[in-house]
Design a protein with these regions (language model features):
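Phosphate/diphosphate ligand-binding glycine-rich loop within oxidoreductases
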Residues: 138-139, 146-147, 153-160, 184-233
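A conserved regulatory-domain signal marking ACT and ACT-like small-molecule sensing domains
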Residues: 1-85
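Adenosine-phosphate binding glycine-rich loop
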Residues: 225, 229, 338-340, 345-437
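Rossmann-like adenosine-cofactor binding region
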Residues: 298-359, 364
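Solvent-exposed alpha-helices and their adjacent loops that cap or buttress functional pockets
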Residues: 1, 40-41, 83, 125-131, ...
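Glycine-rich phosphate/diphosphate-binding loop of Rossmann-like nucleotide-binding domains
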Residues: 145, 152-170, 222, 228, ...
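An N-cap/entry alpha-helix motif that binds or orients negatively charged groups
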Residues: 93-126
């Protein structure tokens, strides 16, 4: 697995010195992600170099840099760890508590009046607490990023990252919750026991197939939004990218043939949303026959990688297998989304060189574009659940903000505002609120 490695190199400030370092990096077969000048002093420049490096990569790189007459390997940067030190989130008061009167109002004895008001009318919890701005981010650590089953504690930095993004992008409070259980019954029971503290539930990094059962059961018993982000957040951004790509090519997404390679949580969520969107022919490939049965129940067709590459206009891959798609199987005009992180099934540049009309990987097609606005909009509408209409509205909003790219900048707060507004509008429609029929569960 390739994980960004950050090294510090001191280079003489003269022509060609840095180029020699970069040549060594290229000869080692490493990809340069980022290059930053840290400081210059006494004729030397200190450079921070971010590389894509395998965990078992040849560490001769450092010795080769040291061997250059104009450069010196200083060490590795702790930038990533420094940004995590002490955690990435905290709870703060919305207003100063700096007088005894304020203290008595927000805590004892004044808070008792608010407690009694909520006891008399439970709906007032929405007026006098932060519940409508609070999301539980829950994991059991069985499918953390591309790292797999590493345990809930090791996944806490991911959950904190989600919470930080909620706060930064849509001003929601995300609360990471780690569950030390793999059993679906225990997961559901625990979440049901604590759900009153939260306006919505985000399920994160639960392994398939248990993730499907857990989400379905929670949706059946909780009258609040529940979303497994690995399924539906990824599906929303994928749909947005496909809307953008097909519009630019003058094609209809709904009459295109789509192949989904890999039918875990993300792949299954993508198939389900594409079918809900109205895509007529969706093929799916996976080694697990139960996964094939699951998508066939949605109206998709079981298939193989070879058939998908040969017949489909659009190919999506979420297998976690590096270089799974042979470049020679790419057909001119195909749209290729190889979404596995940190390493894709095929490099987008390679796919484009083989004739793909559009190609992207998981670095750009990222669910951070979807989940903040999805939850902000659902909470603002007091929606009892997420519906297909809400997910599709989010995808359309993302596509509308794409500009010259397949998807917009995930740090553009206007994107998240647009997504939230679209989701809230969709949630308020009668069918979404359960007033005119029951929408297909997500």
């Amino acid at each position: 697995m390739k994980i960004p490695e950050i090294i510090i190199v001191e280079v003489l400030h003269q022509p060609g010195s840095l180029a020699k370092v970069l040549q060594v990096i290229a000869e080692e077969g490493l990809v340069l992600e980022h290059l930053t000048s840290l400081r210059r002093e006494q004729g030397r420049t200190l450079w921070e170099i971010t590389l894509e490096m395998d965990e078992d990569a040849n560490r001769s790189l450092y010795q080769r840099i040291d061997a250059l007459p104009t450069a010196r390997f200083v060490g590795k940067s702790d930038r990533v760890f420094n940004r995590h030190r002490g955690g990435k989130i905290r709870t703060v008061s919305r207003s100063p508590i700096n007088t005894l009167n304020i203290l008595r109002d927000v805590y004892t004895p004044g808070v008792a009046r608010v407690c009694l008001a909520i006891k008399a009318d439970p709906r007032r919890i929405h007026d006098y607490t932060s519940i409508d701005n609070t999301v539980a981010i829950i994991t059991n650590g069985t499918a953390i990023l591309g790292l797999g089953d590493i345990g809930a504690a090791a996944g806490l930095p991911v959950m904190e990252g989600k919470a930080a993004l909620f706060a930064e992008l849509v001003e929601l409070s995300g609360v990471p919750i780690l569950l030390k259980t793999r059993d679906a019954d225990s997961v559901v029971a625990t979440i049901c026991a604590i759900e009153q503290s939260f306006g919505a539930i985000q399920l994160e990094d639960f392994a398939a197939p248990e993730c499907f059962e857990i989400e379905e059961r929670l949706r059946a018993v909780l009258q609040k939004p529940v979303l497994h982000d690995d399924q539906h957040g990824t599906a929303v951004v994928t749909l947005a990218a496909l809307i953008t790509a097909t519009r630019r090519l003058g094609r209809s997404l709904r009459v295109s043939s789509v192949g989904q390679i890999g039918l875990g949580a993300a792949g299954t969520g993508i198939v389900r949303l594409l079918r809900a969107y109205g895509v007529g022919r969706v093929l799916g490939a996976d080694r697990n026959p139960l996964a094939i049965e699951r998508i066939e129940s949605m109206g998709a067709e079981g298939s193989t990688l070879e058939t998908i590459m040969a017949r489909c206009d659009i190919v999506i891959a979420t297998t976690g297998v590096k270089n799974l798609i042979p470049p020679e199987r790419v057909r001119p005009g195909q749209i290729i989304l190889a979404l596995s992180n940190p390493e894709a099934e095929i490099d987008p540049l390679t796919a484009m060189e083989r004739g793909a009309a559009f190609a992207a990987d998981g670095k750009g097609i990222n669910n951070v574009l979807a989940f903040p606005g999805l939850f902000r909009g659902a909470l603002a509408a007091h929606a009892p659940r997420f519906t297909d209409a809400m997910l599709m509205a989010a995808a359309d909003a993302i596509a509308q903000m794409a500009g010259e790219d397949l998807v917009p900048n995930p740090l553009d707060k206007q994107v998240h505002e647009r997504v939230a507004a679209a989701v809230m509008t969709a949630a308020m429609q009668p069918v979404a609120m359960g007033e005119a029929g029951t929408p297909e569960p997500t």
